[in-house]
Amino acid sequence: MADMTKEEFSQSIRTYTLNMYRLAFSILRNEPDAEDAVSEAVLRAYEKLGSLHRAENFKGWILKITANEAKRIYRRNKWSSAVEWEENMSPAFYDEHHELWDAVMKLEQGHRDVIVLYYYEQCSLKKISKILGCREGTVKSRLYRAREQLRRMI
């Protein structure tokens, strides 16, 4: 178990908040829900801090919790009509790569997740497979297909 003080936990959360938000937003496509997912993930992570075995694994661990929270919120809200993501998107977040980000957000969920984790969060294939709970080969094929779709879109 990683012995982390409250201050170390807070600092680690501050370090990865934007990463957590981008991942949650890629799943939910809605700014308020993504913010809720991040908040819930922080609470859940603090409650389960004892399950973190090594502090070096914090990023992957917190992103896995964030993905799970975002998916839980998505399932909860699935029945309601979705608000168009463009209406809720914070422009400062993607100014420079607007066209690419638009294309990424149009990908199906599985492809969007691997693109965000690989390119935006710079996670390894192995780490992505752990976060998403699938095999590394599946991650590779999703990444390949997502790139092909993006090439056709742009």
Where are these regions (language model features)?
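A short pre-motif secondary-structure segment
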Residues: V114-Y118
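Internal acidic/polar
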Residues: R72, W79-M105, S124-K126
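A short, charge-rich alpha-helical start-of-domain segment used by transcription regulators
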Residues: M1-R22, R112
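Sigma70-family region 2
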Residues: A2-D3, E40-N57, R76-K78
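Arg/Lys-rich amphipathic alpha helix in sigma70-family domain 2
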Residues: G50-H53, K64-V83, R145
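DNA-recognition helix of helix-turn-helix
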Residues: L132-I154
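Amphipathic, Lys/Arg- and hydrophobic-enriched alpha-helical face
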Residues: I13-E31, K48, M153
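Short, small-hydrophobic-rich alpha-helical interface motif
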Residues: M20, A24, A34-A45, I65, ...
